[in-house]
Amino acid sequence: MENVFKAYYESEPGLIEITAGETGIITLYFTKKKSNLKSDSKSFPVHLKECIRQLDEYFKGKRMTFDLPLIISGTDFQMKVWNELKKIPFGKTASYKDIALKAGNVKAVRAAGNANNKNKIAVIIPCHRVIGSDGKLSGYAGGVKRKKWLLEHERNSLINN
């Protein structure tokens, strides 16, 4: 069994909890409070330290993509959806229908939404960039307010750089 490490990152839209194994990032999500189970940062694997560094660059508007090893598993369709999410450009959005089409099944809009919802690595796999076909912000595990913040942050970063 692989060792698991936990770290926290304070961002403007809220506290982020990151878990990593010895070979990659396992989860990254917004949380309300720190758990008592936390790792000593001296023992963090290189990719967890790198994740924190890349998040810092992202929130400073200096990073548009992430280059980190991820430990993810899901159905074939979920993996296709998550791969398509990573292709949505920084500062841009796509609809659930767009994602379903690119994942290979235009009729699987609801399934694409469910796969989006099952994403355990927020921000890095940018599920916040998916919006309704009507352009409305809907559903985000971190809350619609954070989704709006992230999208505005990305757009503002593009304008300011």
Could you say what each language-model-derived stretch is?
Residues 89, 120-123, 135:
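Histidine- and aromatic-rich ligand-binding microenvironments
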Residues 85, 109-118:
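Major-groove recognition helix of helix-turn-helix-like DNA-binding domains
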Residues 1-107, 153, 157-161:
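Basic nucleic-acid-binding alpha-helical/helix-turn surface characteristic of O6-alkylguanine DNA
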Residues 123-130:
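Short Lys/Arg-enriched helix C-cap and helix-to-coil transition segments
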Residues 133-161:
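…primarily DNA-binding HTH/wHTH and HhH modules…
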Residues 68-70, 112, 137-140:
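Short clusters of hydrophobic/aromatic residues that line enzyme substrate/ligand-binding pockets
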